[in-house]
């Protein structure tokens, strides 16, 4: 019995050390996100389809610079395209991440907005490269704070890799 416990602890330590390697300087990041499950709230809470694509680079250990582009369909009158940049800090000990950024939104009826985008989430690593990243976000609208700001839950799928 003691042998099983020791081997289990040994494999857990090896697995934890391997998980930290994902946060090394020089890694690249590709991801896709959605918050289409209706798990967000704003004054304009109707049907919604949101898809985003992200790419990034780990410029220091645990620090990731990310660019994003995406599409947000809210109803037949409001489709939005967005582009933004974010900086993410990955907490190596537990997989949590803190992220902040900004995005520019262009909507159908000549609607333009800039939003600040703080976010907190978790990286569930399936292996050394593939993650599922649920996160809580708040999109703070600078043009219409009361009607366009929203908070919610989004889920991402990401791939961390080296360029060699």
What are these regions (language model features)?
Residues 1-5, 22:
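Positively charged n-region of N-terminal signal peptides that target proteins for export
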Residues 5-15:
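Sec-dependent N-terminal signal peptides
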Residues 16-21:
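Sec/Tat signal peptide C-region and signal peptidase I cleavage site
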Residues 22-38:
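Transmembrane beta-strand segments of Gram-negative outer membrane beta-barrel proteins
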Residues 26-28, 45-49, 77-83, 112-116, ...:
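Residues that define the transmembrane beta-barrel architecture of outer-membrane proteins
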Residues 29-31, 124, 148-164:
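Outer-membrane beta-barrel "beta-signal"
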Residues 37-51, 68:
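Surface-exposed strand-loop-strand hairpins of Gram-negative outer-membrane beta-barrel proteins
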Residues 56-136, 159, 164:
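Gram-negative (and chloroplast) outer-membrane scaffold detector with strong preference
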């Amino acid at each position: 019995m003691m042998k099983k416990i020791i081997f289990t602890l040994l494999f857990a330590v090896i697995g934890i050390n391997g998980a930290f390697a994902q946060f090394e300087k020089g890694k690249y990041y590709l991801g896709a996100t959605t918050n289409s499950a209706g798990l967000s709230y704003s004054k304009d809470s109707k049907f919604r389809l949101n898809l985003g694509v992200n790419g990034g680079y780990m410029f220091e250990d645990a620090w990731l610079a990310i660019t994003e582009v995406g599409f947000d369909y809210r109803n037949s009158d409001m489709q939005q395209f967005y582009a933004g940049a974010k900086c993410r800090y990955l907490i190596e000990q537990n997989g949590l991440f803190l992220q902040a950024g900004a995005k520019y939104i262009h909507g159908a009826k000549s609607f333009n907005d800039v939003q600040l985008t703080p976010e907190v989430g978790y990286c569930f690593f399936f292996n050394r490269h593939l993650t599922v990243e649920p996160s809580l976000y708040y999109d703070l609208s600078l043009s219409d704070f009361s009607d366009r700001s929203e908070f919610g839950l989004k889920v991402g799928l990401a791939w961390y890799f080296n360029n060699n």
